[in-house]
Structure formats: C-alpha cells, structure tokens
Amino acid sequence: MKFSHSLQFNAVPEWSESYIAYSNLKKLIYSLEHEQITLQQGAPDEETRLLEHERRSPDDRFMFALDKELQGIVEFYAPKEKEIADQYGRIKGEFETYENEYMSQGNNINYPTPERLQKSSASRKSGRMARSQELPRITSSNREIYLNGQTSDGGYAAPAISRAESTAIQPSEPHDVDTSKNGLSKKQHSEAQPEVQGNDDEVEEEDDDDDDEDEDEDEDEDNNNNNRWLLIEQYPSDIVAYENFVSLKRKLTQLYVSIHDLISYVHLNYTGFSKILKKYDKTLGSSLRESYMKRVNQAYPFLPATGKTLSKRLNIVAEWYAKLCCQGDTFVAIRRLRGHLREYVAWERNTIWREMMAMERRTQAARLSGLKPVAADEKESEQPPYFTIKTKFGVFRIPRCFFNSTIATLITIIVIFILLLSFPVIDNREQNNCLALLVMVSLLWATEAIPLFVTSFLVPFMTVFLKILRDENGSPLSGKESTKVIFSSMWNPTIVLLLGGFTIAAALSKYHIAKRLATSILAHAGRKPRSVLLTNMFVAMFASMWISNVAAPVLCFSIIQPLLRNLPAESDFAKILIVGIALASNVGGIASPISSPQNIVALQNMDPAAGWGEWFAVSIPVSLLCIFSIWFLLSFGLLKDEHITLAKIRSTKDTFTGVQWFISIVTIGTIVLWCLERRFDEVFGDMGVIALVPIIVFFGTGLLTKEDFNNFLWTVIVLAMGGVALGKVVSSSGLLELIALKIGNAVSSLNTFRVLLIFSALTLVVSSFISHIVAAMVVLPIVHEVGSRLADPHPRLFVLASGMMCSLAMALPTSGFPNMTAIMMENEAGKRYLKVSDFLKAGIPATLISFVILLLIGTPIMRALGF
C-alpha cells in the first residue's frame, strides 16, 4: 500500500486538512524532476528560457514547500494540545472528587450485595407493586441517563465492589458510550494500532484470547438484566453516584481517544516528512533528507518531551479508567478503551505476485467498465433479457446470456467431444476415450472458453469417469485405482520446484532485493536511448532468470516509470522501451529452469531431467545472442528518437539490511544446490526436494506470511498440474505411443536436424497463438515420444529445444505473460502506450531471429552435451 493511501485511511476525518499534503509534495517532486531534465536537454524554447529565469534551486523550492507544511502542522498542533490539556485537567479534578466521595474506604453508599441481590430476585414477583409505591419514582430524564450511560463492557461498577456485583446493575439493552458528537464510532481495533506504552504489544496479542471471558460477562449481564430497575429503586442513594460514574466514564473514554488521535497525528506526519524527503533525494539525486529531518525533530510537535507528555497522560487516563471500571486492572482497561479507537489500516510490503493479482483485477475492472451504464429513467434494454420459444409442450424462455461467442465455442467443443466418444476413430476404447479427452482439453485451453485452471481440474475428473488409465498389463484400472494414480501424478517434485521459484521471487520482491539490484545496474546506464534500452533488456533477462518471466516485466515496468513520466508525449522511445523489456523477458524465459512455467513442463518430459549446469550451458549463450540481436533490431530499425536526453534512474542509498543479506544467502545457496544436484543425488534425490529449502526457511521464519503464500499464482500452478496429469493419461492409455508411431513413420526418412526443425517450427506457431505453457503441455509429450522412436533417438534434445521455443514465440500481444503485461501499460492520461501493430513490427522479426539462433547455436551445444 502506498503511504498516501495509508495517510488517507488513518487520518482523523475532522483533521484531514491539517495533515502533511503528501500527494501535492509528490507532484512537486515530479515537476522539479521534469524541469531539471528540460534544462539538461538545453532545448531553446520558451519553456527552457522560463526555467532558466527561475533562480532558486530545486532544494530551495522544495524546502519552501516543506516549511509551509511544517508550519501548518505546528499551528494546528499547539491549540489542539492545549484543548486536550485543559480537558485533561478538568477530568482530573472530577476524578479526584469522585474518588474521594464514592471510592474511599469510608463511603456510605448502599451498594447491592450478592445476598441482597438474591433476596430481591426472590421477592420481586410478590412485592414489586408495593415497593414501587413506597420508593421515589424514577423520572424519564434519569431513565434516559441510565440507558445512554451504560456500556456492554462491565455495567455499573466501582472499585469498592466486586465484578460480579458490578454486572448486576445494567440497562436491559446494552448501549455503548454515545460519542457521535465527537465523530467517534466503535470499531474493532486492528493489531497494527500505533503503540503508546511498553506493554501494548502484550495487550494486543491477548485480544483474541479474551473471547471466553467476554462471553461469560455477557451471560452474567443477560441473567441480571431483569433486576436492574428493581435494584436502583431499592437503593435510591446510589442514583447520584451512578450518574457521576456514567458521566466520568464517558469523559475518560473521549479523552483517551483524543490523546491517542493526537499521538497518531504526530506519528503520521513525521512518517510523511521522512518518506517524502526520501523520495525527493532518490528522484533528484539530492541529500536533503538528513539535514531537513533535523529541523523536523526540533519542531514542537516532534520533540521527544512532547511525545513523552502525551504518552504519560494516555497511560494515566487508562489507570483512571481501570480504577473506575475494571477493579484496577489496567490491562483490561486498555483493551476496552482501544475498542473505541478508529481502525488502523496497516501498511504491508507487496510481493510481485500480489502486484500481478492487482493488475489482473484492474484488467477485469476495465472490462466491466466498458459496459454502458443505464440511467434510472431508462429501460435496461430495448430487448427482453430472454428468448421466447413456443412449442406444443409450452413456452420456454432462454436467457440471452446463453447466446454469445463463448457459449457457442463451449457447445461446439462439447459436441466434438461427444462425437469422438460416440463414433470411435481408434478401436481401443481407452485410447479413443483419451483422444476425445485430449482434443477437448486442448481446445478448451486454446480458446479459453472456460478458465484455464478449470480445464486442468477437468482432466482428473474425466480420466476417472471415462476409465482411461491402464495397468502394466493393459487392463483398465477401476475408479478407485484411477483416482490414486491420477492425483498422485499431479503432485510431484516438478510442481514443488515451481513453488520454490515462486517463493524466491516473493522474498526478493517483498524486501526490494531484486529492485535494488536492478536500479543499481540501471543507474550506470547513462542517458542515451540505445544504452538505456540495452541495459533495461539485460536487467529484464536477468530478473527473469530468478523471479520468472511472469513477474520480471512487472518489476521492470515499475523501475522505468521515471523514464516514461518525463518523455515527450510524441516520443516513440516509450514504445520501444516497453516492447524491448517484454521481448527480453520472453528470452529470459529460457535462461534458467525456473524462469518460466514451460521450463518446468520440459523438465517433466525429460528422462533424465537436464541439470542446471547443462541448462545454463545452452541458455546463456543463446539468450545473450538473442538480446543483442533484438536490441540491434529495435535500436537501428525502429528507434527514431536518437538524440533525446533521458531521466537518470538513481539507485537507493540505503545499506543492505541483515534480512536482505539472509534472503540473498539462502537464495544463492539454493541455486548452488540446484546446479550441483547430480552430485548430491543420494542426499536430496531431486531438485524438488531442494526447492523446499527456501519455502521452509522463508515461511518458517516469518519473512513471508500466509497472505504471501495465498498470493502465489495458483492458477499457473494448477495449470501445470493439469498438464502433468494429461501427460500421465496420454502415456498410460497408449495413445501417446500410437501418435508417436504414426509421426515417427512419417519422418523416419529425415535426419535429426530436419525433424528438430519441423518440431521447433510447429511449437513456435502453436505457442504464438495460445499460451506458452499450454503449448508446452500439449506438444512436449508428443515430441519426447517421437524423439525416442527415431532411428537416431534424441528425445531430450527435442524436448529442450521445443521447450525453449515455447518462450521464444513472442510475435503477438497474447504470446506469453510479458507481452500481455506490456500491452496493458498506460500513461498518466490512461492511454495505452502500445498497439497491436507495435508488437507485430517488433515481435515477428524478433521471433524469427530467436528461432534461427536457437537452431544454429543452441542445437550444436546440446549435441555436444550429449542431449
């Protein structure tokens, strides 16, 4: 969450105009940055001459704005503190008076004891009328005081009597303290509430453990509600004390909230100054933060003595409340008082996966926003929401929502599936059923008629239902046996390897390690368009190696925001830069085994799986050549703005923390173990077991939370599991062997390179039009089986080359996650940077170049390694 949002949500509504104008200061920073770049370019236009006329430096102008904000905060704080101090003094006198009169040892107030409570309860039915005639009548005004003055957290209580007695005198319908005049509302306190005293952490940690105690108190309250008015009427000498008790309790609650709000006001403004100065230093390359924060620390609201005074008064108010209502238990008093505080919205670090989920939600919202709103006085639609079909059996109404292209596609696929089952094209029943399932699942994945992960769940369901799986003897498995086999295949070491990659990506992004490394590299890229483009492409490729090419574009696009923000509106460098990062991320998808989901599928279809060292030996030279070739294409073929001066990306000046070092060491250690996995085969057994190391360490130590785990791209994980299940089904049924035999006979006369050329081209075309991972799940099992049946078998060579080709298919905006992320990029006006034609101009030649490099450079390396 951005601090501007945190400030908005946590500010006291009545004081909203008196907080630091964080958003305005941020706009000023961007304005100063733009002016600085304009002056550096030296353009002899009117804007430049006006800027040169401005004599003050950016530091002076920004300090002037900060001084104005600081003065406003001081001017607001001083009278507000005096107001609360006066209120504190008045309530202190009232409490001392109440304590001397009613809470001393020698008081004569006739409080009801348990014995009296029992007697009064037993004699209520027989003597109510007589007593009501003898005792003074309770007026409507007094009754209103009783009803409005009580709360549900303890009822009538004073330290001189027991808690059980205190719950006896309460209103029949519990009411909270009415604080509406002060803008207060009772909300559940968040654990992220700012602390005000040493034991507050313990107080908040125990909140959830007090539910049973609260329920017991509520039960006592309900049991004694019937005796309420009877006891007050029996003991009229308590009425004055009770009125004073209710009034004092309300005032203490309001005072506690007011002091706490003032503490929160100081805390939020101090954080705001610190963050906005850090942003200024980072954006303009200044060092203003340290010097100006000294000035902030000397302002009256931020003096240590001022904070200590507020905290001391807050604790004293809690002690008074404890004496008045909680038998002197300050722990309980603080918990109850905090129930009246505003809910605090905590700031949390984002992982890259949470940002991707937010992007997906924004995309969905954009789709929904395209629907035309209907005015209140208009009909929702000129057409009825259903079709009416009249038959001799009656009138049938079918909703119009069933008549669209998606439903038509889904119905067509289902019809094809039923036809394949009804009219077998293969004599063997299991193989024919498997063919029908394979065709249906492939079409559903290709058309996305239903969500991709839902189709993955359809695979095990239809496998068991159609009795497709067979045992080693060729006999069909029963439903129970099929269930065990298919679900056990879906959870395997390859899926755990994917989870391990997601975990590393989450840790590196949450603690800004990946971003710091990227900005440190980009800070040395200079300001020339070609060098900036090349550096960004290398950063995107390197990031894809370790946080996957699904997440790397999101990281890179966030880093280049200062560049995009300061480019002229008519510049085409923004398009070139975004396309370059997307294409480089696709290339980075082949750089390591965890850099893309399709690599996981490739490993699953290799026996034995390629080691990390073998993978790097192929991927690094191919990736570097592809990056240089695509950069040359973009720089000298498509880039027109060659002489613009770009904003400089500045690296952070913060030192590497202990947590960041720990995460880096664990990550590097895991990667080293992956590279040396063959040497530790007897120890770990598989790369999936090594992938458990970062999962256990990062989640076990609390560096990553269950929310981070929930934010993983589970749709991708389930999709990979569905692909593994489909591969198991096609292999077990014998269909894969049959398909491989047919294709093998057709290409038996061709040499290995020509067969590889055919499969690589087929994979490239399929991956360009459907998802990369879907293409890998459908094509790679067939490629492996065909490769193993050739006269010169090289199944691992075919699988590795075809798997890499899946990532290198990048011609269309829908070809892979990086392209889909890039096409959604918008400028500050909400207009997209790229059109489909922009991708076609760069994507088609980039794909063909990468195809040639992989075949001419990658294939000889694979052969040399024994693939």
Curated annotation (Swiss-Prot):
Q: Where is the SPX domain?
A: 1-294
Q: What top-level branch of life does the organism fall under?
A: Eukaryota
Q: Where are the transmembrane segments?
A: 406-426, 434-454, 485-505, 537-557, 576-596, 616-636, 656-676, 683-703, 712-732, 755-775, 797-817, 842-862
Q: How does it sit in the membrane?
A: Multi-pass membrane protein
For this record, the Gene Ontology CC terms, alphabetical, are:
endoplasmic reticulum; endoplasmic reticulum membrane; plasma membrane
Q: Which InterPro entries match?
A: SLC13A/DASS, SPX_dom
- Residue ranges annotated as compositionally biased, kind Polar residues, are 138-152
Q: Which UniProt keywords apply?
A: Endoplasmic reticulum, Membrane, Transmembrane, Transmembrane helix, Transport
Name its cellular compartments. Answer: Endoplasmic reticulum membrane
Q: Which PANTHER family match?
A: LOW-AFFINITY PHOSPHATE TRANSPORTER PHO91 (PTHR10283:SF92), SOLUTE CARRIER FAMILY 13 MEMBER (PTHR10283)
Q: What is this protein called?
A: Uncharacterized transporter C3B8.04c
Species for this entry: Schizosaccharomyces pombe (strain 972 / ATCC 24843)
